[in-house]
């Protein structure tokens, strides 16, 4: 990892008018997680992250953008760095505001977050209308989202429906993505794509224009009212376990 500590920037972020009008000091620290061994063995800066360039990126971003909250500044800055630096896997970013107008002898206030890339596996399927077009459009929709990188897509497989409802056969598959989204945010994006395909949730196990499910998200186990990871119905989906996941899990 690379560490850059306590870079001072004068800028105009804050809730109160005088903060944005007069400006004040902000202190930024970053811990950047990357593989340092290739650069260390080759003594080659191009194999690592140039922390000088990163320092200028941070300064330019904070001086060109204005936020009321430190939370917003640090979130947007972390996203910029993760999207801009291919070798950056994860970052712990801290922004301090030592001149915060709290009216008390306080040394500093700060917001610190850790954000990074995650690996998720998503199953897709359709058994209504132009099935291939629905799947193609969904995959392109994922590619168009800046927080998602589609790394690998399985072949489309024809599978028989199950669940006791008489309906047409499915076209199914799975894909692997890298994403900056948390599991719930990723689920919301999948639902947006389903809605764009006019998905109707009328009959349980019924026909659908588009079905998108999170199978895995890193090594997390999630059990909430809206999300279950690993997906609770995987054992009934031979196309996922036998073919699609095997294909997209390969390097």
How should these model regions be labeled?
Residues 18-87, 92, 237:
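Histidine-centered catalytic/metal-coordination loop motif
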Residues 10-19, 159-160:
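Glycine-rich, charged/polar anion/phosphate-binding loops
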Residues 37-52, 137, 142-182:
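Short, surface-exposed acidic-centric catalytic microdomains
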Residues 95-116:
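Short, low-complexity, polybasic intrinsically disordered segments
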Residues 2-3, 7-8, 250-251:
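Short, small-residue-biased leader/transition segments that mark boundaries at the very start
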Residues 3, 26-28, 120, 171:
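Hydrophobic core residues within well-ordered beta-strands of beta-rich domains
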Residues 119-139, 147:
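Extended accessory regions or peripheral subdomains of proteins
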Residues 35-40, 117-119, 162-171, 181-188, ...:
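Flexible, gly/pro- and Lys/Arg-enriched active-site loops
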